[in-house]
Amino acid sequence: MTGAEIEPSAQAKPEKKAGEEVVAGPERENDVPLVVRPKVRTQATTGARPKTETKSVPAARPKTEAQAMSGARPKTEAQVMGGARPKTEAQGMAGARPKTDARAVGGARSKTDAKAIPGARPEDEAQAWAQSEFGTEAVSQAEGVSQTNAVAWPLATAESGSVTKSKGLSMDRELVNVDAETFPGTQGQKGIQPWFGPGEETNMGSWCYSRPRAREEASNESGFWSADETSTASSFWAGEETSVRSWPREESNTRSRHRAKHQTNPRSRPRSKQEAYVDSWSGSEDEAGNPFSFWAGENTNNLFRPRVREEANIRSKLRTNREDCFESESEDEFYKQSWVLPGEEADSRFRHRDKEDPNTALKLRAQKDVDSDRVKQEPRFEEEVIIGSWFWAEKETSLEGGASAICESEPGTEEGAIGGSAYWAEEKSSLGAVAREEAKPESEEEAIFGSWFWDRDEACFDLNPCPVYKVSDRFRDAAEELNASSRPQTWDEVTVEFKPGLFHGVGFRSTSPFRIPEEASEMLEAKPKNLELSPEGEEQESLLQPDQPSPEFTFQYDPSYRSVREIREHLRARESAESESWSCSCIQCELKIGSEEFEELLLLMDKIRDPFIHEISKIAMGMRSASQFTRDFIRDSGVVSLIETLLNYPSSRVRTSFLENMIHMAPPYPNLNMIETFICQVCEETLAHSVDSLEQLTGIRMLRHLTMTIDYHTLIANYMSGFLSLLTTANARTKFHVLKMLLNLSENPAVAKKLFSAKALSIFVGLFNIEETNDNIQIVIKMFQNISNIIKSGKMSLIDDDFSLEPLISAFREFEELAKQLQAQIDNQNDPEVGQQS
């Protein structure tokens, strides 16, 4: 870091070529020495917790001087043997497992002497690049931050089956001499191949590299070819559900959670509360595996070491040091790291880094919190999973920060490997084709750290976890400030004030409540009022008694409503008074509604059930408020004329008077509705008028249109004798309209008996003469066709069993003879020569 002292003893070790052995790392000099400027004064020793004074650089984890190797478990003064579980007293470093004096051999669990082996990402913002055969020189970022003592060692030789050695220590051959079939991408070579560009010499370079890196460069990153070309050796953060299929039998258990919520922001700090920094470089989609690198926000090194057995079980070590940056609204960030210290219980340490003070040292959240973020694992399916730490300590796994996990499967198990992912996901992430267990959902409002795996399908969480980040409601503070005692206990205590608007009918109530009479409520419900006729014939409406309780309407109604009797008296008083001396601001006076128009309005309200028409009537009655524009429009057009226009009624006072008189004459037809009464009135007046008069012709036309439906056929059939008489006395024009009306009736079997009576048949037959118009004859023919179809369908027998067909049969025979004679007469008229010869 800037301003830190130079540690001369820190040097980076170059990577060996393929086919060579790695000799003792400390004795070799690097071609380009890497100057490390750590702030740490005390040298980390074996078995001691590192004391760090490293400044926190943005988007970087704190750095300790103790360096570890990626993908290797810590060892304590012991050689690494294949399949042996290590016991360690090593100190942990951010982003790596604790290391002791051991050197790393290719693909095996290694011992290191505080050296960073390829696969361990430096904790500073600048990652060191160890020099490789590609000519990649160790670089550091321009900021001049310190680098770790990285020694780039190849994990395995590519051109020979020899094992990379470190300090002369041997290792299990089974871990290195891997059959080439396990690695389809190694081009038939034995050993563990890193991912490099095509045609390059396959050497595993350092996994420590700086952030500014071109995509064209070879990706010598952590990851190896898995048993399947189509499977990836690590998890790619692409916003999708993570799937790692590096297990030969595709039987793996997944315990992974990430906080990314499908939001990956490469090389940038997440702005959401639960985002992770991800920069994943993937090669071509056609390749079997994709190289990956997680940058400053999240330093993740995944190491899979395949081992070939009879069942091709893989000992995979998924190593992850990640950092979740949680930003609250105060721009505070919590950094969690996975440092496991020897001989201690599990505890959680979080680095709080404030935006204003980036140099805050690492602080402990809990010194010896045994219950904080502890995960205990028991053997499942003849295998044990190391969770949350890099060593075994009396089968108790310590997790510090919850960011480290190891996936291990014993050689003889049939379950494959239980994969522990190094990132957290709120949704299920799968390693392999089959997930043994499902990730437990956790609350969105509280981040619980330290448990990625489950013991017997039960999540082991601390009862009192150390709160890292909790979502707080933005509006909760304002709501909590309200005093509960001041809140109303009942609705009676609630007072709502409404501001009067221009149009209360749009859903706003008036400024003052009012009570509306019962008769007005009947209008609202579109029910006809009970009209009581006086001896003089005038209608009297039942009025609301003062002592009777009336329903209360608290919305949309104006308090100036008056009863019908009050309105009538008011309008009569206005008519009797002089117009010059009369001054009133009521709605009836404003709309200029007279007494006669008001009575017509009452009749229309009784007859019409249209709610829109009722709204207009309510405005005129004073029951509903309206804007000034609406009132002016109703006044200029007239309320009755407006309603009649909307109903397509004739906009004339004569028609309104006719309807009013018809209603007053309703007692002769007490069981008929308004339209039926009107039809009966029209039939009587039509037959009463003089023959061929204009009034009679108008009535017949109206009845012709009313008979388009069968609703009123029975009523009109009662006047059949009168209409048949018109066929003998009226002119051709009147006959045409009468026959049109009877043609409509002929389609109804219910009136066929009256229509085709003996008298009717004789009249119809009498129309077949040379003097009758062709149109009238054609209508009569259609009528006989209709009755013939009714008889053939059997509908006539269902309606009337007593209906006799004898008159119809005789009429049909006579009709045929008349038709032939008529046709001959027509032919003679069209051909004069034939007529003269005959």
Curated annotation (Swiss-Prot):
Modified positions (Phosphoserine) in chain numbering: 282, 284
Segments for region (Disordered): 1-121, 218-293, 531-552
Keyword Repressor: no
Pfam families noted in UniProt: Arm_2 (PF04826)
GO MF annotations, alphabetized: amyloid-beta binding; G protein-coupled receptor binding
Cellular component terms per the entry's GO annotation: cytosol; nucleus
Biased composition (Basic and acidic residues): 13-31
Superkingdom, natural source: Eukaryota
Keyword Phosphoprotein (UniProt): yes
Chain intervals with Polar residues compositional bias: 220-235, 542-552
Composition-biased stretches (Basic residues): 255-271
SUPFAM superfamilies assigned: ARM repeat
Keyword terms: Phosphoprotein
GO term, biological process aspect, one: hematopoietic stem cell homeostasis
Gene3D superfamilies membership: Leucine-rich Repeat Variant (1.25.10.10)
Known role: May play a role in regulation of a variety of G-protein coupled receptors.
Family statement drawn from the similarity comment of this UniProt entry: Belongs to the GPRASP family.
Record-linked PANTHER family: PROTEIN BHLHB9-RELATED (PTHR46414)
Assembly with partners or alone: Interacts with cytoplasmic tails of a variety of G protein-coupled receptors such as muscarinic acetylcholine receptor M1/CHRM1 and calcitonin receptor/CALCR.
Full protein name: G-protein coupled receptor-associated sorting protein 2
Lineage of origin: Eukaryota, Metazoa, Chordata, Craniata, Vertebrata
